[in-house]
Amino acid sequence: MLTIKANLRIYHKKGATRRLRKQNKCPAVIYNRGQEPSIPIILNQNDILHPEAVIQLYKNNVILLFIENQQPITVKVQELQYHPFKSKLIHIDFTRV
């Protein structure tokens, strides 16, 4: 099982996410089941683009996210959005398992 460290994302607007991407970070969202609100998070590009991590992301395996000051969350990848010509992720959507 792949484990990734994440931080909560406070700012959700376009300018804030662009600044994150320039800092080699990747914005992501964890969608919950039912009426619970989604959780916006920030991931480090180096953790995600590691060869073992890429394989796990594409296999749609269960991933364990460690978010600061919270219990670990088990998720699956719902969608990966890549930059058109750079080898960087733009955004990831996770679904809570």
Swiss-Prot record:
It comes from the Bacteria. GO terms for cellular component: ribonucleoprotein complex; ribosome. Keywords: Ribonucleoprotein, Ribosomal protein, RNA-binding, rRNA-binding. Pfam families: Ribosomal_L25p. Coiled coil: none annotated. CDD domains: Ribosomal_L25_TL5_CTC. GO terms for molecular function: 5S rRNA binding; structural constituent of ribosome. GO terms for biological process: translation. This is one of the proteins that binds to the 5S RNA in the ribosome where it forms part of the central protuberance. Belongs to the bacterial ribosomal protein bL25 family. Part of the 50S ribosomal subunit; part of the 5S rRNA/L5/L18/L25 subcomplex. Contacts the 5S rRNA. Binds to the 5S rRNA independently of L5 and L18. This is Large ribosomal subunit protein bL25. It comes from Blochmanniella pennsylvanica (strain BPEN). The gene is rplY.
